[in-house]
Amino acid sequence: RVIIAGAGCGDYDLITMRGYEALKSCDVVIYDSLIDSRLLDFCKENAQKICVGKRAGRHSSTQEEINTLLVEKAAEGGIVLRLKGGDPFVFGRGGEEITALKAAGIPYSLIPGVTSSVAVPELAGIPVSHRGLSRSFHVITGHTADDLLPEHFESYAKCGGTLIFLMGLRNLPEIASRLIENGMGKDTPAAVISKGATPEQRAV
């Protein structure tokens, strides 16, 4: 069987207890390069560790190759842990992986992870909702699969809630320009956070 788990964002100690237990018991762990490598120390000594290197801009494995690997390893028996940065279902392609497992008849379970979209602003002292200021928050990709900006900037600029762009540092100037062009005030409070949930976190 396959367990698809979120490792949490940033430092290793943000993984959930359920994720930690899965690490200790798995026979194979297929992990992203975004996770804190110290998490692998919790695995059994004989556990097979396979890095699939998913990172924006440099993928060592395609999503299709990862899907195939999950099915193949599950067919060999034992517990296969797919460990993903943050939460598997927040821009983590977890849905694509369970679709492949369903098609192959492979049983699976899911373990949520702490998502950077909420945890990183919190660690910077920024609430994503605040009474009287923001009654909603919206999580948006900072770039699409073909490295373009997302659509619907007119809606984002006028929604009135907190906007959280993930993986958007490279496109930051254009994101800001598009929001302003579509009606967002130039004096709207904003923050840019890098290396979130680590000792190197920086916010401006």
Regions found by a protein language model. Give the residues of each.
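Beta-strand/loop-alpha-helix module characteristic of Rossmann-like adenine-cofactor folds
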Residues: 1-2, 99, 107-109, 115-204
